[in-house]
């Protein structure tokens, strides 16, 4: 929670799970060290049979940027070995979400980096307003899954198992994770390439124009060295602006694909799947970034296209 006086833990009516409150500040900045210590402490207590659990749920303040949290899980040497990020769930208020996106760039980042967006208060607004809000969210994050919730009902089975970074991931989940739905109206069409440009009746909100996305699909296998070089070049030059990059990759010399994802300059370990989710054996990569134009994003990804047809020089 943000601030020294914690409140949310007192509002839970009943819980059999372990609740840990960190009061030293905003999770996106000053308490990242506390996060590591807290999670390690929970793991130690589980090892000593004091408590039993399978998952750890981290609820941040609405002011938080998910990026630093994800980086902590990736780079902390203990957490990287003992935990795996299952996914980012963002709750978006259907009644006030548009105003929040206009006013708070943190909200834009939360939407752009989410694996799942839960729309709340959909019963308080018209279906058309919900539809328009979903279109705006998909413009920020084309591959995100969006579900509706009224008073939190029906969510229990939908917020788990979001990550496909596991060998036994379901084929349909892998495809949804890398492709998502193609937006019908994209106010960022000049950036994302997911839809043709359309004349808008209102100006695009300033925060939204800072977020762009691009994708690439490749039929031929990529040399491992070429893939590493292209990704390392991208993150070394524009790492701080990369909100998220993820993909399904066909590497030379491997029968099954790898899935990977990263935030800014930090990447989780790639995981090889047991099989291809489709018969086409295509590499699919999606990148969501801040303050990068569509041509810049596409040029970075097109380096991979070059290396699928041109052998790397011998070292």
Locations of the language-model features?
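Nucleotide-state-sensitive switch-loop elements of NTP-binding domains
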Residues: 2-100
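Short, flexible active-site loop motifs that bind/organize anionic cofactors or intermediates
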Residues: 25, 120, 217
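Residue-level signature of catalytic and energy-coupling elements of molecular machines
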Residues: 1, 35, 59, 88, ...
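Conserved catalytic-core segment of NTP-binding enzymes
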Residues: 69-143, 148-152
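Small/polar loops that bind or transfer phosphate-bearing groups
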Residues: 31, 58, 121, 219, ...
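C-terminal accessory "lid"/substrate-recognition subdomains
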Residues: 109, 116, 124-283, 290-315
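Short glycine-rich or small-residue beta-strand-to-loop segments that form or flank ligand, phosphate
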Residues: 57-60, 117-119, 215, 285
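Helical mechanochemical/support elements of P-loop NTPase systems and associated helical scaffolds
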Residues: 3, 27, 31-34, 65, ...
């Amino acid at each position: 929670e943000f601030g020294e006086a914690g409140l949310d833990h007192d509002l839970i009516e009943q819980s059999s799970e372990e609740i840990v409150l960190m009061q030293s500040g905003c999770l996106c900045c000053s308490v990242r060290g506390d996060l590591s210590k807290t999670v390690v402490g929970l793991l130690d207590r589980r090892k000593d049979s004091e408590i039993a659990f399978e998952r750890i749920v981290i609820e941040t303040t609405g002011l938080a940027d998910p990026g630093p949290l994800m980086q902590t899980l990736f780079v902390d040497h203990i957490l990287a070995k003992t935990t795996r990020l299952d996914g980012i769930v963002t709750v978006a208020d259907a009644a006030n979400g548009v105003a929040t996106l206009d006013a708070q760039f943190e909200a834009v980042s939360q939407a752009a980096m989410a694996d799942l967006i839960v729309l709340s208060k959909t019963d308080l607004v018209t279906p058309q307003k919900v539809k328009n809000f979903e279109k705006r969210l998909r413009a920020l994050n084309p591959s995100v899954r969006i579900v509706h919730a009224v008073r939190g009902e029906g969510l229990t089975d939908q917020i788990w198992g979001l990550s496909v970074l596991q060998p036994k991931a379901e084929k349909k989940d892998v495809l949804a994770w890398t492709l998502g739905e193609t937006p019908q109206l994209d106010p960022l069409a000049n950036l994302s390439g997911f839809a043709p440009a359309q004349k808008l009746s209102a100006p695009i909100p300033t925060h939204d124009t800072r977020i762009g996305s691009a994708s690439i699909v490749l039929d031929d296998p990529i040399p491992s060295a070429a893939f590493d070089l292209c990704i390392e070049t991208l993150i070394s030059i524009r790492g701080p602006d990369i909100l998220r990059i993820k993909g399904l990759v066909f590497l030379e010399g491997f029968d099954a694909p790898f899935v990977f994802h990263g935030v800014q300059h930090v990447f989780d370990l790639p995981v090889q799947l047991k099989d291809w989710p489709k018969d086409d054996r295509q590499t699919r990569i999606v990148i969501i970034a801040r303050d990068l134009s569509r041509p810049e994003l596409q040029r970075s990804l097109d380096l991979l296209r070059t290396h699928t047809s041109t052998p790397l020089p011998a070292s």
